UniProtKB/Swiss-Prot annotation:
The keyword Lipoprotein does not apply. This is Nitrosuccinate lyase. Pfam families: ADSL_C (PF10397), Lyase_1 (PF00206). Belongs to the class-II fumarase/aspartase family. GO terms for molecular function: lyase activity. CDD domains: pCLME. Keywords: Lyase. It catalyses: 2-nitrobutanedioate = fumarate + nitrite + H(+).
């Protein structure tokens, strides 16, 4: 049986059905087609304001263009379809914008896109979109960091099994694990802020020489190009570019790299949560929300869906970022294909990373930590989790090789017999000759073998009693 979509549903190109990590999140709207169109309008109006500031476009014309240029006056779907004829959306956009301005002021319409080129407008618009998405992302990262600091402080000395290559290794604390997550989130936050501060305008004209701008300005002076770039940067709030970057794609590659790191940082948290939430581990659980995590087949399940969503994004973003790095191989002064290949992967980087950050806020602010289960799991190996400690104490007494061999044999025997390491060691003359029962019991207490974990937590969060300042989302 064939199902027919209604015209309304058919018109919805991408609602996030297959990308739930970002569906309905704030960043989704910030990087939508409508947001890009609004940024293109802003790029064009900022350009004409900059030209008017330098006296090369009449103030009245600039004012008329700014007044008439409204995204809602443009047909987004028509522009998208028209872009198939020109391989970029700006050509049709400029034509439509000129018509809108001409309907209000025909003389002013002559100054729309004056001396410019498609890539100047779309690249600048892209930087505006990246900046706005970044504000949302940094706000979410700040909330993640605050939640992680609370977890690290609360569980500074909460003992749990440290696991290496999936197996119990030595004891650690959940606070140290949370502090490690905090370190990654803080670094991601720093990188997004540094990226935002460096986002540049694009102004190069047809082939990177700004010749069209200069010609239309009618020989205004040798420093006009520099002054125009500065004025354009002022009008947009972006950074002035040292050179046109039509084929020098550092800002785009940097955006992809920051998104990839951010997604990976959150992905590390997600995979840890998934591992700790396993039925047989049960040390953490995601926030309990009615209906969330339900299985279509198994009524008993409450799946860790938030961690799953974040992990899905973390697995995708690096691949999209790789496309952006590949697009740096842009030939000549303007590329046919490399530039065009960036647009959708860049959007995916932003909305997946932004969706992951927004999802991580809910995960981390509502994460439940089961300290009792953590303590119980420390005893699963019957004391073997502190075999390193016992070997270290016996080494000066027996020698390194003999102490290690003894603990290896004892651990295997305890596992084979299904008994504790303490029982095996208490029957070993090499041990009882040097250690009393009380001393052995103390050595095998996993809560007394946390190393520097609590102090490392203090270092990460600025001390046991000092709050860590979190930067604003600006």
């Amino acid at each position: 049986m064939t199902f027919q979509l209604s015209p309304e549903l058919a018109a919805v190109v991408d609602s996030g059905l297959l990308s739930p990590v970002r569906a309905g999140t704030p960043v989704e709207a910030a990087v939508s087609d409508a947001a890009w169109l609004a940024a293109m309008v802003e790029a064009e109006t900022a350009l004409v304001r900059a030209q008017a500031r330098l006296g090369t476009v009449p103030e009245s014309a600039a004012a008329a263009i700014v007044e008439a240029a409204r995204p809602e006056r443009l047909d987004l779907v028509a522009l998208a379809r028209a872009s198939r004829e020109t391989a970029n959306p700006v050509v049709g956009f400029v034509k439509a914008l000129t018509a809108v301005v001409a309907a209000e002021d025909p003389a002013a319409a002559e100054y729309v896109h004056r001396g410019s080129t498609s890539q100047d407008i779309l690249d600048t618009a892209t930087m505006l979109v990246v900046r706005r998405a970044g504000v949302l992302i940094r706000a979410d990262l700040d909330r993640c960091a605050a939640a992680l600091e609370r977890l690290a402080r609360t569980h500074r000395a909460t003992p749990m099994a440290g696991r290496t290559l999936t197996l119990h290794a030595v004891p650690t604390t959940f606070g140290l694990k949370a502090a490690g997550w905090l370190h990654l989130v803080t670094e991601a936050r720093r990188r997004t802020a540094a990226l935002a501060a460096a986002l540049p305008v694009e102004l190069g004209g047809a082939a990177g020489t700004l010749a069209g701008y200069l010609e239309h300005a009618n020989n205004p002076g040798d420093d006009y190009a520099d002054r125009l770039v500065e004025a354009y940067a002022h009008e947009t709030g972006l950074a002035p570019a040292t050179l046109p970057w039509h084929v020098l794609r550092t800002p785009i590659a940097d955006t992809g790299a920051v998104c990839a790191f951010l997604a990976a940082a959150l992905g590390k948290i997600a995979v840890d949560v998934q591992s700790l939430a396993r039925t047989e581990v049960g040390e953490v659980t995601e926030p309990a929300v009615a209906g969330r995590g339900a299985s279509s087949a198994m009524p008993h399940k409450r799946n860790p869906v938030l961690a799953t969503l974040i992990r899905s994004a973390a697995l995708q973003v690096p691949q999209h970022a790789a496309v952006l790095y590949g697009a740096m191989l842009a030939e000549d002064e303007r590329s046919g294909g490399a530039w065009h290949a960036e647009w959708q992967p860049l959007r995916e980087c932003l909305r997946l990373a932004g969706g992951a950050a927004h999802t991580a806020v809910e995960l981390l602010t509502g994460l439940t930590v089961d300290a009792d289960r953590m303590r119980a799991n420390l005893d699963l190996t019957g004391g073997q989790i502190v075999s390193e400690r016992v070997a270290a104490v016996l080494t000066p007494l027996l020698g390194k090789a003999q102490a290690r061999a003894l603990l290896t044999r004892a651990s295997h025997e305890a596992a084979d017999r299904g008994t504790s390491l303490a029982e095996v060691l208490s029957a070993a003359p090499e041990v009882t000759r040097h250690l009393t029962a009380a001393e052995l019991e103390e050595l095998l207490d996993p809560t007394r073998y946390l190393g520097a974990a609590p102090g490392l937590v203090d270092r990460a969060v600025g001390g046991p009693d000092r709050a860590v300042p979190h930067r604003s989302a600006a």
